[in-house]
Design a protein with these regions (language model features):
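N-terminal segments that mediate ammonia production and transfer
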Residues: 1-205
Length: 206
C-alpha cells in the first residue's frame, strides 16, 4: 500500500507509518530481566511507548518524573525504562530534525484486575499523566500506547522502512496474534511523529 502514503521532497520522510501489535510477553520479560528486575509471573506486563523531547533534557527528565510519580500513585510497580533501538539512517532530513527520544516504560499493577478493568485503569492513569504534562507546559511529549494488551511502533518514515527503523520488529521473540498497519496521507494537518498512525485504539483514513 505504499502508493497510499505521501513522501516529502527529501524522498525519505513520510507522512507517517506504524503498526499496532500485541505485547509480546517473552520479549518484554527478557528486557525486564536484563534491566535487573524479575517479572511477576502472576501479573500482566504493561508497556508505555512514549515520545519524549529529544533536545530538551530537563523537559525529558520532567516527563519521566511525571510518568513515574503517577504510576506509583496509582499503585503500579515500575520495572524500568528502556531506550528503544532505532536506525536513523532510514530517515529523511525532515523526519530526523523532528525525531523525538523514543522510550518504553515497563510496569505492572500491584493489585489483581481483570484485563478490561486493567485497561480502563491504564486509560485513566494515562490521562492523568497527560494532564500533568500540559500543566507543566511540556512540549514534544506524546504517549503512543499505554497498555497491557498492545503496543504501537510508529514514526515519520516510509512504510517499507518501519522494520528497518525499529529493529525490535525483526526480533523473533516479538510475536503477535494480530497486527494493525497504517500509512498516512496527510491532508489538512502537517505531518508529525505523533500524528503518525495507528493511534492507541484506532487507525483510519478519514
Amino acid at each position: 500500500i505504499w502508493h497510499r502514503g505521501a513522501v516529502d521532497a527529501d524522498g525519505k520522510s513520510g507522512d507517517g507509518a506504524g503498526i499496532q501489535i500485541e505485547i509480546a510477553t517473552d520479549f518484554f520479560k527478557e528486557k525486564i530481566i536484563s534491566s535487573g528486575q524479575t517479572p511477576d509471573e502472576t501479573k500482566r506486563i504493561c508497556v508505555g511507548m512514549v515520545f519524549l523531547p529529544r533536545t530538551d533534557y530537563a523537559g525529558q527528565e520532567k516527563c519521566r518524573e511525571i510518568i513515574e510519580s503517577v504510576l506509583l500513585e496509582e499503585n503500579y510497580h515500575i520495572y524500568g525504562w528502556r531506550q528503544v533501538p532505532f536506525n536513523s539512517k532510514v530517515l529523511g532530513k525532515t523526519a530526523e530534525q523532528s525525531r523525538p527520544e523514543i522510550a518504553q516504560v515497563m510496569f505492572k499493577k500491584n493489585e489483581n484486575l481483570k484485563t478490561n478493568d486493567l485497561e480502563r485503569d491504564l486509560f485513566e492513569t494515562r490521562k492523568k499523566i497527560e494532564k500533568l504534562a500540559r500543566e507543566n507546559q511540556l512540549k514534544n511529549f506524546y504517549i503512543c500506547s499505554f497498555s497491557s494488551r498492545s503496543i504501537v511502533y510508529k514514526g515519520m518514515f516510509l512504510a517499507e522502512m518501519l522494520a528497518e527503523f525499529y529493529p525490535d520488529l525483526n526480533d523473533q521473540k516479538l510475536t503477535s496474534r494480530f497486527a494493525i498497519f497504517h500509512q498516512r496521507y496527510s491532508t489538512n494537518t502537517f505531518p508529525s511523529w505523533d500524528l503518525a498512525q495507528p493511534f492507541r485504539t484506532l487507525a483510519h483514513n478519514g
